[in-house]
């Protein structure tokens, strides 16, 4: 690991098929958007290093297929994850209703009890909304999750989602400090004195 990188974090993106998980990932890592992007087969994987409040973190981001036939990949996919982005489509209520199923899966297979979860309502650029923002916020509060609405197409909220998730993980040293205890790394003073969220009105730390 690079000396100036605080830690490497495993981040998962989960949710029903077609909610835009891969599009969010590609917008964040490559700043691209493909409206004809094919459904993920199995698991996709990308790496990106970001800086949050003076601390560099290398993100290993896992994007999984939402289809039921790929669920045999689940146990290894969740193992060792420090953060999860749970995505639904604000124009498809069925993807919101099924969030409980994904949370149950997360609780079943996740190996950490202090993992940081972020709920993302994607596709806010579309007009045919079926899930109100307050519904998403209420669900996130109920399950102690971070929350944001976003659009992979317009880039709205995408960077914020990942940065807020990483910030919260870094503020939870138990998630990563054991991996770095022999490297002498520590948080920057900016992070130690960190107050509110970096994304203004977008994210709610709950």
From Swiss-Prot:
Binding site for Mg(2+): 22, 40
EC number annotated for this UniProt entry: 3.6.5.2
UniProt short sequence motif Switch 1, positions renumbered to this chain: 31-45
Activation and inhibition: Regulated by guanine nucleotide exchange factor (GEF) RAB3GAP1-RAB3GAP2 complex at the cis-Golgi membrane which promotes the exchange of bound GDP for free GTP. Regulated by GTPase activating protein (GAP) TBC1D20 at the ER membrane which increases the GTP hydrolysis activity. Inhibited by GDP dissociation inhibitors (GDIs) which prevent Rab-GDP dissociation.
Gene Ontology molecular functions: GDP binding; GTP binding; GTPase activity
Keywords on record: Acetylation, Cell membrane, Developmental protein, Endoplasmic reticulum, Golgi apparatus, GTP-binding, Hydrolase, Lipid droplet, Lipoprotein, Magnesium, Membrane, Metal-binding, Methylation, Nucleotide-binding, Palmitate, Phosphoprotein, Prenylation, Protein transport, Transport
Modification sites for Phosphoserine: 144
Catalytic reaction equation(s): GTP + H2O = GDP + phosphate + H(+)
SUPFAM superfamilies: P-loop containing nucleoside triphosphate hydrolases
Single GO BP term: brain development
InterPro entries: P-loop_NTPase, Rab, Sigma_54_int_dom_ATP-bd_1, Small_GTP-bd, Small_GTPase
Sites of S-geranylgeranyl cysteine lipidation: 203
N-acetylmethionine modifications at: 1
UniProt KW Transit peptide keyword: no
Residue positions binding GTP: 17, 20-23, 34-35, 40, 66, 123, 125, 152
Family annotation (CDD domains): Rab18
Lipidation (S-palmitoyl cysteine): 199
Motif Switch 2 in this chain: 63-80
Domain of life: Eukaryota
Domain notes: Switch 1, switch 2 and the interswitch regions are characteristic of Rab GTPases and mediate the interactions with Rab downstream effectors. The switch regions undergo conformational changes upon nucleotide binding which drive interaction with specific sets of effector proteins, with most effectors only binding to GTP-bound Rab.
Record note on quaternary structure: Interacts (in GTP-bound form) with ZFYVE1. Interacts with ZW10 and this interaction is enhanced in the presence of ZFYVE1. Interacts with BSCL2.
Name of the protein described by the UniProt record: Ras-related protein Rab-18
Organism whose genome encodes this protein: Mus musculus (Mouse)
Gene: Rab18
């Amino acid at each position: 690991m690079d000396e100036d990188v605080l830690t490497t974090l495993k981040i998962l993106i989960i949710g029903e098929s077609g909610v835009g998980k891969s599009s969010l990932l590609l917008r964040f890592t490559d700043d691209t958007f493909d409206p004809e992007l094919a459904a993920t087969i199995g698991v996709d994987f990308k790496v990106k290093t970001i800086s949050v409040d003076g601390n560099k973190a290398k993100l290993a981001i896992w994007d999984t297929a939402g289809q039921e036939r790929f669920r045999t990949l689940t146990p290894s996919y969740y193992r060792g994850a420090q953060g999860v982005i749970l995505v639904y489509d604000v124009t498809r209520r069925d993807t919101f209703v099924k969030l409980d199923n994904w949370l149950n899966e997360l609780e079943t297979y996740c190996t950490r009890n202090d993992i940081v979860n972020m709920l993302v309502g994607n596709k806010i650029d579309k007009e045919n909304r079926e899930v109100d923002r307050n519904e998403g916020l209420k669900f996130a509060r109920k399950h102690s999750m971070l929350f944001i609405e976003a659009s992979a197409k317009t880039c709205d909220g995408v960077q914020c989602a990942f940065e807020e998730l990483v910030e919260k993980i870094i503020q939870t040293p138990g998630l990563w400090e054991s991996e770095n205890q022999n490297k002498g790394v520590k948080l920057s003073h900016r992070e130690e004195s960190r107050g509110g969220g970096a994304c203004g009105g977008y994210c709610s730390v709950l």
